[in-house]
C-alpha cells in the first residue's frame, strides 16, 4: 500500500488542509492518508490542546473514507519529533510505501529538526508548495505537491475567531460547531 502521513498541528484544521490531502491522495496515488496531529511540536506552541485538535481533525475527515486520523504522536510522551513518528510508522507499516506530507514552509528548516537528515530513510518527503517558499532551495530532496491556492491559514482563522468573526467556509461545519461549543481561539 501507499500511505501518506500528513503531519501538522492542525490548529485548527481547515479546508486548505483537506484540499492538500485530497490532492496528495490523487496525485501520489495513495491508498490512504493518515493525518498525524502533532501533540507537542518542538518548533511552535499550539493554541488549542492536543486532544481538541485531534477531535477537530476527526470531525473534519469523518465523511471521507480516504482519510483517517492517527494518534501516533498523541500517545507518545515527550516532544513530537517527526523522525520518531516516521520510525514508528515504518515499524507499523513495514511493507508499505510511506510519504510524509507537510507544508513547504516547514521543510526550509528540516535540517534543524531532530535527525532531520534521516527522514528520507523512512519516507518519501512531500512538500505542499506555498508562495514564498521555493522548493528548489529545500535542504533535502522533496516531491513538490502543487495545490490550488485558497488563501486560508490556521493563523488567520484564529485571528478571525479572536475578533468574533465568522469562519464559515474556512473550516468544515462540524469543526466550526466544535470550536463554538468549546470556546476555542477566543
Swiss-Prot record:
CDD domains named among the record's database cross-references: NMNAT
Which processes are annotated in GO (biological process)?
NAD biosynthetic process
The pathway this protein participates in, as annotated, is: Cofactor biosynthesis; NAD(+) biosynthesis; deamido-NAD(+) from nicotinate D-ribonucleotide: step 1/1
Q: Which Pfam family, giving just one, matches this sequence?
A: CTP_transf_like
Molecular function via GO: ATP binding; nicotinate-nucleotide adenylyltransferase activity
Key words, A-Z: ATP-binding, NAD, Nucleotide-binding, Nucleotidyltransferase, Pyridine nucleotide biosynthesis, Transferase
Which reactions are catalysed by this chain? nicotinate beta-D-ribonucleotide + ATP + H(+) = deamido-NAD(+) + diphosphate
Query: Which SUPFAM superfamilies did the record assign?
Result: Nucleotidylyl transferase
UniProt-listed InterPro entries: Cyt_trans-like, NadD/NMNAT, Rossmann-like_a/b/a_fold
Q: PANTHER family, per this entry?
A: NICOTINATE-NUCLEOTIDE ADENYLYLTRANSFERASE-RELATED, PHOSPHOPANTETHEINE ADENYLYLTRANSFERASE
Family affiliation: Belongs to the NadD family.
Q: What is this protein called?
A: Probable nicotinate-nucleotide adenylyltransferase
Question: In which organism is this protein found?
Answer: Thermus thermophilus (strain ATCC 27634 / DSM 579 / HB8)
Q: Which gene encodes it?
A: nadD
Amino acid at each position: 500500500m501507499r500511505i501518506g502521513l500528513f503531519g501538522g498541528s492542525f490548529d485548527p484544521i481547515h479546508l486548505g488542509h483537506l484540499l492538500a490531502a485530497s490532492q496528495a491522495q490523487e496525485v501520489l496515488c495513495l491508498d490512504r492518508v493518515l493525518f498525524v496531529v502533532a501533540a507537542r511540536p518542538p518548533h511552535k506552541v499550539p493554541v488549542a490542546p492536543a486532544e481538541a485538535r485531534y477531535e477537530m481533525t476527526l470531525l473534519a475527515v469523518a465523511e471521507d473514507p480516504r482519510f483517517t486520523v492517527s494518534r501516533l504522536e498523541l500517545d507518545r510522551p515527550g516532544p513530537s519529533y517527526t523522525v520518531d513518528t516516521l520510525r514508528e510508522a515504518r515499524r507499523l507499516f513495514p511493507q508499505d510505501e510511506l510519504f510524509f506530507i507537510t507544508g513547504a514552509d516547514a521543510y526550509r528548516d528540516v535540517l534543524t529538526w531532530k535527525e532531520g537528515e534521516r527522514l528520507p530513510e523512512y519516507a518519501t518527503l512531500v512538500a505542499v508548495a506555498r508562495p514564498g517558499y521555493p522548493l528548489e532551495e529545500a535542504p533535502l530532496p522533496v516531491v513538490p505537491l502543487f495545490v490550488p491556492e485558497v488563501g486560508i491559514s490556521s493563523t488567520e482563522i484564529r485571528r478571525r475567531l479572536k475578533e468574533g468573526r465568522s469562519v464559515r467556509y474556512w473550516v468544515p461545519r462540524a469543526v466550526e460547531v466544535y470550536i463554538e461549543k468549546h470556546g476555542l481561539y477566543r
